């Protein structure tokens, strides 16, 4: 329900759980998820949390959304590879948990010097870029690279953290970079990129798009977002059958299809 608390997408959050898990039991107990999501949304609104509502904005040419989708899929594959690769590397060469945590923390601090905004959840960075996107190409490239590496090292060294927020920041970096190159830094490009990275890396194309559209209220850009998400999802399926979650199950020797709805 933290997703609802920070981004205020009650419907998208419900679909997200069903789309990612596809667990047979959810067909019976799905109402619990719906109640939890809507309750969290209601409490968050009472505490002052609201959707971003960035308003209308010009839509860039369509080829930029196709490019965003391609880059999102490639970065998602890289994200999964780096995440589990860094874990294997650190566990192998630093078997002591305490030492592994120290090494990981040192690497994260060193990487953070390149772009400090890549550290943390990044909610304020995302909102600022959506509302006032005046950053340069180097900022977006360094943001994406540093976030990919710091998230991989943090989780690989035994630290705590999620996947959704890093995926959003990586998406912002992709959308921002494409916007600078195409000389069209529109918010809808960032929204499409965030939705595409979530869709490709987590395996949630429908909820990925819906969550970001609910969050930004940029419904007039839904067609363009759909192009990017479809491109990212299709290319991701061609490149790998794994998502960032199913990869973990595969490494543990668990057949995820045994409890999924087909």
Q: Where are the regions a protein language model picked out?
A:
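Alpha-helical transmembrane segments and immediately membrane-proximal extracytoplasmic
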Residues: 1-262
């Amino acid at each position: 329900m933290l997703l609802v608390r920070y981004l205020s997408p009650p419907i998208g959050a419900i679909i997200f759980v069903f789309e990612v898990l596809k667990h047979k039991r959810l067909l019976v107990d799905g109402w619990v998820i719906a109640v939890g999501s809507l309750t969290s949304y209601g409490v968050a609104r009472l505490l002052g949390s609201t959707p971003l509502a960035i308003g209308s904005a010009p839509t860039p040419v369509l080829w930029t959304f196709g490019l965003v989708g391609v880059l999102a899929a490639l970065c998602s594959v890289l994200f999964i590879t780096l995440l589990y690769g860094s874990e294997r590397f650190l566990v192998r060469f630093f078997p002591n948990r305490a030492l592994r945590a120290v090494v990981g923390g040192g690497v994260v601090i060193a990487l953070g010097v390149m772009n400090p905004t890549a550290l943390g959840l990044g909610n304020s960075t995302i909102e600022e870029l959506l509302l006032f996107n005046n950053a340069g190409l180097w900022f977006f490239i360094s943001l994406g690279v540093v976030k990919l590496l710091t998230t991989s090292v943090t989780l690989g060294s035994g630290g705590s953290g999620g996947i959704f927020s890093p995926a959003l920041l990586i998406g912002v970096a992709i959308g921002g970079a494409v916007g600078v190159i195409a000389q069209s830094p529109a918010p809808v490009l960032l929204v499409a990129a965030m939705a595409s990275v979530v869709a490709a890396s987590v395996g949630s194309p429908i909820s990925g798009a819906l969550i970001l559209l609910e969050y930004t209220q940029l419904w007039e850009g839904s067609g363009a977002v759909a192009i990017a998400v479809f491109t990212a999802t299709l290319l991701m399926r061609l490149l790998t059958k794994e998502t960032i979650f199913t990869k973990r199950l595969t490494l543990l020797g668990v057949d995820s299809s045994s409890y999924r709805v087909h």
